[in-house]
A protein has these predicted regions:
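Short, hydrophobic-biased segments on the C-terminal half of alpha helices
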Residues: 276-280, 479-480
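C-terminal or mid-to-C-terminal helical accessory/interaction module adjacent to the motor/catalytic core
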Residues: 114, 118-198
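Short acidic, hydrophobic short linear motifs in intrinsically disordered regions
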Residues: 242, 251-264, 290-298, 451-463
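Structured, non-catalytic alpha/beta "coupling" segments that mediate domain-domain communication
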Residues: 14-38, 170-218, 381-426, 592-594
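A short, conserved structural fragment
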Residues: 283-297, 485-494
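Metal- or metallocofactor-binding catalytic centers and their adjacent structured scaffolds
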Residues: 213-253, 435
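Basic, low-complexity terminal or inter-domain segments flanking catalytic cores
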Residues: 2-3, 24, 98, 152, ...
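Intrinsically disordered, low-complexity regulatory segments
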Residues: 1-142, 150, 219, 223
Length: 740
């Protein structure tokens, strides 16, 4: 009989199956096949304090389990080949229990990449299931069930139905709420900057006045700014000093889960969830020039380790492709600063150095290629020499004022050869010390300090990682849960807490402070790491948490006052005659009929009902009914009056047409508004799927003649070639800036 290899996903099974002969059958469990029940608590606490999870097999996976049991009976050897992390170890344990085998009796094979060599090596070196890792995952699962199952009903009874709390979820939400609190109490402060333009077009800024150094907040008001400007205009200036320094730009480390999600968000516009979905495909197997195989290593990791073989391949490629000046004398090693990083794993890297982005483009889908290129280039970059830059500083001294000019020059591109370098050289002219210079222009500018920026998905993940909240596998799901539960909204890539989030966090801060305490959550993660390392008993961790937590639940049921906003108003509903109530929803307070859902009458607190949609004489192009004008967060729009039967919606104001043809089909290009802001798309959509987040321009790329777009990024505004193969980019001149 064949040997049986059990993995989680069908895609992974198909890829591994292509590497092995007829002696092996590779099948998938299709994820978790044994878990705590959805309909009950699922944890029994024995008299001696032992926690016994009551795992069950969900009905929908019974056919899979039946098939696995049948194959297991016929198999000569059964290999567990789930992912090498705690969750994978736990899935392997549950597979063994489901097919009625002793977990530690089954050989366990592990690999960081799905390639023929890696699978064959794993089969030659099987080990046992790591029960410490299994118990660490069981402890996490039971902790999350205890918090979610016991605290969520309390929130529902005291605030509003449908609310939930979670060990990682709630501490993450508090970070978002705290940032919004900072923004609400922020008071802007006035300050001024003064820019000087010296001869030969040398841009500078005020550095000192009357012998005192000027920093960002030194010039508090217009009076002081005016004094400096008037003085500088009549002063004579000389070059006081010239300084050139060489500095190195360090090579970036390879990607781990959090940094991949951050870079994919900022550079590709991918959400963390999308990044992990695409990375999963690249890991489990895609078409390549050498057949189906995984083209990146395992994507859920907090390690920066790299195999010596992979580094050796990268060094050979760098030497052959770029030359010896790009290759460090010794290989570069990196270590993770993440709390609890599992350094036995590898960083995320390509599995075949010969599968370059140029080759990969013919085999991968658009999103797969974008993410693969990001991973491939980062891996190469981490083994290349540092870039060298020259920074230039020049001081112009007058009788009272001193101005400072800065320049820079890229001396050696190093790793920028593969990652790209977006800054243009800004060279200062050759002047001599003591040489007289003329101040041609001077401009004072008023500013106000800005509140801290709201988190985007990338910066929130970075914050969670720095605080030790969660692990690589939990970052993306945590943000998704907060969105699903309507605790946050994401508008123009920024995370906003909803009204109900403030109410929930306030209650948790007052009565369950440890649940929203980042230090407590981080320490809990550290304890789970100790269980994984065999240094802490998982039952002790659960017992230490359970008793004080449950006492707070009992006390909370009695002492926490109801915050449900269902207060009688003493007024009657004009539609059905029932009493009107003052309620609190996810987006604030409102008045509603007590006869809901039979009567859906609502008004705002001032008694204004939701505005009736404005009728139009425009007919729906899908069903023929008339369109009406409705309001949304992003403004007014046209919607079909037959909603919800017909869900057709269109912008109220026709999109602006650009006087530029689509580079793909020649049709018109339209300026549109989407969830992430303004974008530009072909009028011939969906037949033509041209899209750009930069405004197309009439000018052509000087290197490849493709279309050029104007992009507004955090780092500034750039002209950029639309052809991804071409890396041409230049900074937009000051007089052409959209947001000066």
């Amino acid at each position: 009989m064949k040997n049986l290899i059990i993995v989680e996903s069908p895609a992974k099974a198909r890829t591994i199956g292509t590497f092995l002969g007829k002696k092996y059958k590779v099948v998938a469990s299709k994820g978790h096949i044994r878990d705590l029940p959805k309909s009950s608590f699922g944890i029994k606490v024995e008299e001696d304090g032992t926690f016994v999870p009551k795992y069950s097999i969900p009905r929908e996976v019974n056919p899979t389990v039946k098939e696995l049991r049948k194959l297991a009976k016929e198999a000569e050897t059964i290999y567990i080949a789930t992912d090498e992390d705690r969750e994978g170890e736990a899935i392997g344990y549950h597979i063994a229990m489901a097919i009625k085998k002793e977990p530690e009796s089954l050989p366990r094979i592990v690999f960081h990449e799905i390639t023929k060599t890696a699978i064959e090596n794993a089969l030659e070196n099987p080990r046992k299931l790591d029960m410490d890792a299994v118990n660490a995952q069981q402890a996490r699962r039971l902790l999350d069930r205890i918090v979610g199952y016991k605290l969520s009903p309390l929130l529902a009874s005291k605030i509003q139905k449908g609310l939930s709390a979670g060990r990682v979820q709630s501490s993450s939400l508090k970070i978002v709420v705290d940032r919004e609190r900072e923004i609400k109490v922020f008071k802007p402060e006035e300050y001024w900057t003064i820019e000087g333009l010296f001869e030969k077009n040398i841009e500078s800024s005020i550095f000192a006045f009357n012998g005192k150094k000027i920093d960002k907040m030194s010039i508090k008001d217009e009076k002081m700014a005016t004094e400096i400007v008037h003085s500088a205009k009549v002063e004579s200036f000389v070059v006081e000093s010239l300084e050139k320094k060489e500095r190195k730009s360090k090579t970036p480390p390879p990607f781990m889960t959090s940094t991949l999600q951050q870079s994919a968000s900022t550079q590709l516009g991918f959400s963390p969830k999308k990044t992990m979905m695409v990375a999963q495909k690249l890991y489990e197997g895609v078409k390549t020039n050498k057949g189906n195989m995984g083209v990146i290593t395992y994507m859920r990791t907090d390690s920066l380790n790299l195999s010596e073989e992979a580094v050796g391949d990268a060094r050979d490629y760098i030497l052959d492709t770029f030359g010896s000046e790009y290759l460090p004398k010794t290989l570069k090693k990196y270590s993770s600063k993440s709390k609890g990083a599992q350094e036995a794993h590898e960083a995320i890297r390509p599995t075949m150095i010969g599968f370059t982005p140029i080759v990969a483009k013919d085999y991968l889908t658009g999103d797969e290629f974008k993410l693969y290129r990001l991973i491939y280039n980062r891996f190469l970059a981490c083994q290349m020499n540092e870039a060298r830059l020259e920074s230039q500083t020049m001081l112009f001294k007058g009788q009272r004022s001193t101005f400072k000019a800065n320049g820079r020059k890229l001396l050696f591109d190093g790793f920028y050869r593969v990652t790209g370098y977006s800054e243009n050289d800004k060279l200062l002219p050759e002047l001599k010390k003591g040489q007289q210079v003329t101040l041609d222009d001077i401009k004072p500018q008023q500013h106000f300090t800005e509140p801290p920026a709201r988190y985007n998905e990338a910066s929130l993940i970075k914050k969670l990682e720095s605080l030790g909240i969660g692990r690589p596998s939990t970052y993306a799901p945590t943000i998704t849960i907060l969105q699903t539960r309507k605790y946050i909204t994401i508008d123009k890539k920024r995370i906003h807490p909803t009204e109900i989030a403030f109410t929930v966090i306030k209650l948790l801060e007052e009565h369950f402070s440890e649940i929203v305490d980042s230090s407590f959550t981080s320490n809990m993660e550290a304890d789970l790491d100790k269980i994984n390392e065999g240094r802490l008993d998982w039952q002790k961790l659960l017992a230490d948490f359970y008793e004080p937590f449950m006492q707070k639940i009992i006390d909370g049921k009695k002492s926490i006052k109801s915050q449900k906003m269902a207060i009688p108003t003493g007024e009657m509903c004009p539609k059905c005659g029932h009493e009107l109530l003052r309620r609190k929803g996810r987006f604030g307070e409102f008045i509603a009929c007590s006869n809901f859902p039979k009567c859906k009458y609502t008004t705002d607190l001032d008694g204004n009902p939701p505005p009736e949609p404005e009728k139009t004489d425009i007919k729906c192009d899908k069903c023929g009914e008339f369109m009406v004008i409705k309001d949304s967060k992003r403004g007014k729009f046209l919607a079909c009056s037959a909603y919800p039967k017909c869900k057709n919606a269109q912008p109220l104001v026709p999109p602006r047409e650009l006087d530029i043809p689509c580079p793909k089909c020649g049709s018109k290009i339209l300026e549109k508004e989407g969830k992430r802001g303004t974008f530009y798309g072909c009028a011939n959509y969906p037949k033509c799927r041209f899209i750009s987040n930069g405004e197309p321009l009439k000018r052509k790329c000087p290197e490849c003649e493709s279309m050029v777009v104007h992009k507004v990024l955090k780092t500034g505004e750039f002209y950029e070639c639309i052809d991804k193969k071409c890396k041409w980019k230049e900074r937009v001149p000051n007089d052409k800036l959209k947001n000066p």
